[in-house]
Each structure stands twice: as structure tokens, then as C-alpha cells.
Amino acid sequence: MLFQDLSFPAAVGAAFGAFAIYVVARCIYDLFFHPLRNFPGPKRAAIWSFYEFYYDVIKDGTYLWEIEKMHQRYGPIVRINSRSLHIHDPEYFSTIYAGSGRKVNKELSAVSGYTFPHSTISTLEHDLHRKRRAIVNPYFSKRAIADVEPVIHERLDTLISRLAEAKGNTVDLTCAFSAFTADVVTYHFYGSHANYIGSKDFKYGLKDALTVLLNLYNLTRFLPVPPTTIKNLPLPILGLINPNFPLVVSAREANKKMVLNYLDKPDEEKKAMKDARSKSVIVSALADSNVPDEEKTLDRLLDEGETIIFAGIDTTARTLAVALFHLLNNQDVLMKLRKELQTIAKSDGQQWTTTELEAVPYMRGVVQEAIRLAYGLVVRIPRISPHEALQYNGFVIPPGTPVSQSTYLVNNDASVFPNPQVFDPERWVKAAQDGTNLDKYMVSFSKGSRACLGINLAYAKLYLGIARVATSLDMELFETTRADIGVYHTRGFAFPKEGDGSVKARVRGLCK
């Protein structure tokens, strides 16, 4: 044999030598022979993913701003690693994130940081994604979400009551909104909630588990083993990787218990739950005979549940917190919103609907600005056109090339949103009056056939949550600045420069 007569040190040296030769050959290929070799961008970024690894892992999720610098130097299209391109052009966003008329796959790096391989959001191939999405789409339509509004109002009643009880004290609005969104989304998925709003200081294990996953997001994208392999390691080993990682396992076990509780119910009770007006997604999916058996496996249902729940908690809670920060930070905006909402004031015992609130121009402007400045997913989510070459700015992008844009860069593009860092609801009011379709550039929920599944549920929580909290409670900011809601790191979601980015407020009492 070739290495039979080599000593162990010599064999190790030979292995390292072979690896070094491979690395050199790969670098030469990436720079001089790769199909993307002629695209603009720094040469160091074109070599494998070393440059991206440095900024996202070593420098804690800051590659986004390095990409921004690349665009400033090289133009609207740049090569950001050996096989991927990034474009900054708000007009081209819908071409990359295409609708159902063109087949678009998701690139592996977009999901390799997640630990839910059987979920719709982690599905790479276009046709399988379309089938999985079709199963749950009906339960996230506007009509379906309208049936959930009574639950949203009931949870808001409890939230506002708890905040009012804190009169004279400081509350963490971000945690409070997180508990609210968690209750709503778990109810919609499982048909029940755990009353996270009732938890001490609005803190609960599910949110802690999400934080653990997000803190590991950038690293797991580059690991040579799937994240699920790590998640399935024994708890003592997981504890060594991250002392809080067992929280993730505990959260999955809690979700598993909820699924198994349903499976153990008598058929008559399952049928009654299926026929209920506000049925949960998982119950309906399990009960629907049209759903293939392979889409009803326990792992599939757990992964689907966890992604919908995790995605629906943090992004909406952050958006609510961003909205309240700007309202409390600018009393003129808050007073104008309250005045506008007085035009559709309800008598005792009646509540606003999302549709009614959407029809109030200034209310809509507040919601859209909060969404714009909360950004949604700030990480790149590359798309692949598997069979069709894309054309952009004189370049032909080969089929199979991962291409992405950044919601953060689009939402801060001054050519679309002048003074982009200013919270200005009037920009949406004026755009509507002028006949300008500013919604075309609202990309926080992404676009196309893979746009956010829960967009209608998110809007319902935002409209109802902002309107009711802003008109019910008298509060003032406490030790919270713009830096606390700013984006300085990307770990799947947006993270501040330091701390947890919480918006804190002192409760003065109920509005008179």
C-alpha cells in the first residue's frame, strides 16, 4: 500500500501536504477558471468562503457591512465567495426572488444554519417546497387569520393588563411582545398556548432556546456536519458546546409532547378539532387525507412547528418593539397616531379588526416603517435559478449560481427611502397620495413564491398590537437608545452592538 511503510508522523505530514495541494489548486481554480471569475469583487472574497467565514464567525456576523463596502467600490453586482453573487438593486429584487412562474431553488447555505431540515423553510428544491407550502398556505390566508383575531385580542387584553399592573415600574417591552407573539403563534399551530404572557418578567424557555440557536447560526453554517447531528448529541456534550444548548432540546421535547397529545386523542375529538372554525395548522394537516403520509412523520411535523413558531416569535416581537420605541421617542408621532385612531374609535366591548386599521393611512405608515426598520431576516437568503441564465447590468449569470440581495441594504437605500434611518410614517401616506407603489420595495418579508408564510399573521399582530398598546398605555422610554434597536450583527436575525437589544419603558398607567 502507498502509506503502509510510513511512520505515523510521516503519514500525517503526507495528509497535510495533500490537503495543502488541494487548497492551492482550489484557490487557482476559483481565481482563474471558475465561471464567476470575471465578476467584480475583491479577489480575497473569491477564494472559497474564507473571507465570509472571517467576518461572519470570527467577527460575529458582520459580513453584511463588508458586502456593502464591496458595492460602494465595485458596483451593484459583486462576487462575495467562490460560488455566489450579491446584487444591490431594489428594482431587481423580484427577479431574484421570483414568483411561481419561474423555478427557483434555495441555496444550501441559506438553511445550513438551521436545525430543522424537514421544514418547508429548509426545503431546497422548488417543486417539493411548492407541495409543502400548499399544505399550510390555506391556514395563513387573510380569511384564516381573521378567524384568529379573537385570540390575538384576548392575548392583548392579558398583556395590557399585566403591563398596567406594572405602573410605576420598568418593563422589558421586547420580552413582553415576545411572550405575546409566542402565545398567538403556538395557538395557531397547535390549537393551544402556554400563557407565556403570564411568565415571570415575560421570560420563558422557548425564547431562550431560540437565542441559543441564533447565537450558533453563523458557526453552524460552516460546520462540515449537519446541525441536526449536533442537536442529537447527548445532553452533557451539548452542554460543553454551549451551556444553554439543552434548552433547545427541552423546547423540542415540549413541542413533541404537544404533537403526541393530539395523536393520542380519540378520532371523534380529532374530527371536532378539524371542523372547528379556528383550527390549528398541525391538526388540520394531520387530519387531511390529501396530505401524503411522508409529510406526516413526527420529525416533519416537529420541524415545521418549530420553524413557524420560532420565525413568528422574534421577528414580530422585534418589529413591535421597534414601533413602540419610535412612538415613545417621538411624542408628535404618537399623538398623531392616537388622533387618527380616534376616527375609528370603538364603543365598549368592541375591538378593531386588522382590515379597519389597515384603512387608516397613518396607522399603515407606522406599521410599514416599523417593518422596514426591523428588517426581518437580515441574513442573505440566496436563490438559484437551476436552468435559466439571469441577465443583469451586462452580465450573464450562469444557471445554478446562488444570487442574493439584502433586506437591510434595500430598506436603507436612500434612492427609495430618503433619510432611511428616520422613522417617518408620512412617507407611506404621501406615496399613496401620489400613486407611488412604495410597497414594491418592502422586502422584509422577502418576495416571490418563498416569501414569508406568516405575513398575514404578522400583519394582524402588528396592527392590533401597535394600535391597542399605543392607545391603552401611557409609558416613557427607560435607558433605551437607538443603539439598542440598531443592527450591528447578523445571526439569522438582527442583533445590537451589545446586550439583547431590549426596549425598556416605565409604565405611568392606563391612558385617560
Curated annotation (Swiss-Prot):
It is an enzyme of class 1 (oxidoreductase). It is a single-pass membrane protein. Its EC number is 1.-.-.-. CDD domains: CYP58-like. The keyword Heme applies. Pathway: Secondary metabolite biosynthesis; terpenoid biosynthesis. GO terms for biological process: mycotoxin biosynthetic process. Its main location: membrane. GO terms for cellular component: membrane. It holds the Pfam family p450. Keywords: Heme, Iron, Membrane, Metal-binding, Monooxygenase, Oxidoreductase, Transmembrane, Transmembrane helix. Heme binds at residue 452. It is found in: Membrane. SUPFAM superfamilies: Cytochrome P450. One of its GO terms (molecular function) is monooxygenase activity. The keyword S-adenosyl-L-methionine does not apply. The fungal sesquiterpenoid aspterric acid (AA) is a submicromolar inhibitor of dihydroxy-acid dehydratase (DHAD) in plants and is effective as an herbicide in spray applications. Cytochrome P450 monooxygenase; part of the gene cluster that mediates the biosynthesis of the sesquiterpenoid aspterric acid (AA), an inhibitor of dihydroxy-acid dehydratase (DHAD) effective as an herbicide. PbrB catalyzes the second step within the pathway and converts (-)-daucane produced by the terpene cyclase pbrA into an alpha-epoxy carboxylate intermediate which is further converted into the tricyclic aspterric acid by the cytochrome P450 monooxygenase pbrC. Belongs to the cytochrome P450 family. This is Cytochrome P450 monooxygenase pbrB. It comes from Penicillium brasilianum. The lineage of its organism: Eukaryota, Fungi, Dikarya, Ascomycota, Pezizomycotina. The gene is pbrB.
